């Protein structure tokens, strides 16, 4: 049995293993699955920060932080901010707020955020 698990771990893609571990991490913290959220509902989602970028919105800067839980992704938009300490790619974070739909992606404007270990 141990040999079978070792062979399975060595032959599976690293991305698949990382995705499963991230999904288990989010499930253990009772965060909503990102593939099950809908627009205009209050959610608490979390995962790993995939990207951080500054985008001009209505003439003012906005920090967009994309977070993925292995099943989907949500973009946290912090209006009027250029950076937030602790929010960098690879960190794990939870967002809480009301979702909005922008094309195919979900946004949470000025979410309450919590850095996770």
Where does each model-flagged region fall?
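Amphipathic, hydrophobic secondary-structure cores in small proteins
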Residues: 67-69, 74, 82-83, 94, ...
């Amino acid at each position: 049995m141990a040999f079978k698990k070792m062979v399975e771990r060595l032959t599976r893609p690293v991305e698949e293993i990382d995705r499963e571990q991230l999904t288990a991490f989010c499930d253990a913290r009772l965060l909503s699955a990102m593939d099950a959220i809908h627009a205009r509902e209050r959610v608490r989602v979390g995962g790993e920060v995939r990207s951080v970028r500054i985008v001009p919105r209505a003439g003012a800067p906005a920090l967009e932080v994309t977070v993925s839980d292995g099943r989907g992704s949500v973009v946290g938009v912090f209006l009027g901010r250029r950076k937030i300490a602790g929010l960098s790619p690879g960190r794990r974070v939870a967002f809480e707020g009301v979702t909005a739909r922008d094309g195919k992606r979900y946004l949470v404007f000025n979410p309450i955020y919590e850095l996770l270990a």
